[in-house]
Regions:
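Amphipathic alpha-helical segments used for helix-helix packing
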Residues: 96-121
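Short, basic, alpha-helical segments at the C-terminal edge of helix-turn-helix-like DNA-binding modules
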Residues: 60-66
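Helix-turn-helix
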Residues: 11, 15, 19-53, 57
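Hydrophobic alpha-helical segments that form the core
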Residues: 101-110, 146-165, 177-185
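N-terminal intrinsically disordered/low-complexity leader segments
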Residues: 1-7, 190-195
Length: 195
């Protein structure tokens, strides 16, 4: 008979978040989840409701942490704050270890089809948060309000592209180059307003 392991729920979900973030959903079996998180198969079923529910709980944890992050809060500091958001995201000295895997939510969207409502709900939360933060800052910063909607979408797309670039390369340099270019573009919007 195997020994049961007690693991604190918060630590278990954090470990699951890191595991799913780095490995994805489909490639993980319950044995690997058990070995790397300390969550027994029994606990996986009875406490978390199975692998998919644990995955969704881990994704919720990621989104909660993102909502509270200083990096996301930097967007509120005008065009310079937005530029720094991108530059910080690609800076390996500023990045959380899991961040080298790109964006957990973007990785999830690439792995799953669009017909899973629980994943779509979390994607909507993520995109809504990004759009609102970018749009609010642009609305407060740009004189020409007709550019806010289009530039908001450019920034959301740039966020996705940067995260894909970070995930795709073992070395940080391509992401850093891209982030710096995005930062320069955002700063130029302020110069356009003054011209």
């Amino acid at each position: 008979m195997s020994r049961s392991r007690k693991v604190e729920a918060g630590a278990a979900v954090s470990a699951a978040m890191s595991l799913f973030w780095s490995k994805g959903y489909a490639s993980l079996g319950t044995r690997q989840i058990e070995e790397e998180t300390g969550i027994t198969r029994f606990t996986l079923q009875t406490t978390y409701g199975g692998k998919m529910k644990l995955f969704l709980t881990a994704l919720d944890r990621y989104l909660d942490l993102l909502d509270q992050s200083e990096m996301l809060a930097s967007i509120d500091a005008g065009l310079e704050g937005i530029a720094q958001f991108f530059e910080t995201r690609a800076d390996p000295t500023q990045m959380h270890e899991d961040g080298c895997q790109g964006c957990f939510l973007l990785n999830t969207l690439i792995e799953f089809s669009a017909d899973i409502p629980e994943v779509n709900k979390r994607a909507t939360r993520y995109f809504t948060t990004l759009r609102q933060k970018f749009a609010t800052t642009l609305e407060d910063t740009l004189i020409d309000k007709t550019k806010v909607a289009a530039r908001t979408e450019v920034l959301v797309s740039a966020t996705l592209g940067l995260n894909a670039m970070i995930r795709a390369h073992e070395q940080p340099q391509p992401g850093v180059v891209m982030a710096n270019a995005i930062g320069d573009m955002v700063r130029s919007w302020g110069e356009d307003e003054q011209a």
